Amino acid sequence: MRYTVALTGGIGSGKSTVADAFADLGITVIDADIIARQMVEPGQPALNAIAEHFGSELIAADGTLRRRALRERIFSHPEEKAWLNALLHPLIQQETQRQFQQATSPYVLWVVPLLVENRLYQKANRVLVVDVTPETQLIRTMQRDDVTREHVEHILAAQATREARLAVADDVIDNNGAPDAIASDVARLHASYLKLASQFVSQEKP
């Protein structure tokens, strides 16, 4: 198994910006959200199953999934959310495993928004948390997704708390300031992770 750094953070924290900075340094990034989106692209069996289960009104005219409509449907129906998770989780795990096997960089950055909620931090060698204040999360998400404050507050209430994420963190990037500051933080952590990955490999050898 390749040395794995799990990256997490709440909605609007800037996980993608941080992940992109690691990718620019040549690190393989495996993003659970991107994989989940790929699983429901037109032509994928999962999208057909969703249309069959929830109805064709969740499929747009161009054949793509109406994500917001699906989110609204499962938000107020826990049993529907459970059905969707049972459909997608095995597919996501399978694709994640495939990408890990194909990774070539000294360590892998595994981006998992629900790392704490699903207790997946146990599968990583190290946990990196992108930390921002809840108010920053609200403002950024409202601007990015063009949604109401109330909508974002509902999402925040369903996610792990800031304290719960920080409790499992080995490293923290404070992303409350300007995005430019991220590059230096990532460069510093990258140097540290290269050393840790090298030690990990030497310990793994018989």
Swiss-Prot record:
Key word Transport present: no
Chief location: cytoplasm
Enzyme class of the recorded protein, top EC level: transferase
Annotated localization: Cytoplasm
The UniProt record lists the keyword Nucleotide-binding: yes
Taxonomy, superkingdom: Bacteria
A Pfam family it matches: CoaE
Domain DPCK intervals: 4-200
Single GO cellular component term: cytoplasm
GO BP terms in the entry: coenzyme A biosynthetic process
PROSITE patterns xref list: DPCK
E.C. code: 2.7.1.24
SUPFAM superfamilies: P-loop containing nucleoside triphosphate hydrolases (SSF52540)
Catalyzed reaction equations: 3'-dephospho-CoA + ATP = ADP + CoA + H(+)
Molecular function via GO: ATP binding; dephospho-CoA kinase activity
PANTHER family cross-referenced by the UniProt entry: BIFUNCTIONAL COENZYME A SYNTHASE-RELATED (PTHR10695:SF46), DEPHOSPHO-COA KINASE-RELATED (PTHR10695)
NCBIfam families: dephospho-CoA kinase
Function as written in the Swiss-Prot or TrEMBL entry: Catalyzes the phosphorylation of the 3'-hydroxyl group of dephosphocoenzyme A to form coenzyme A.
Protein's UniProt name: Dephospho-CoA kinase
Organism: Salmonella typhimurium (strain LT2 / SGSC1412 / ATCC 700720)
Gene that this polypeptide is encoded by: coaE
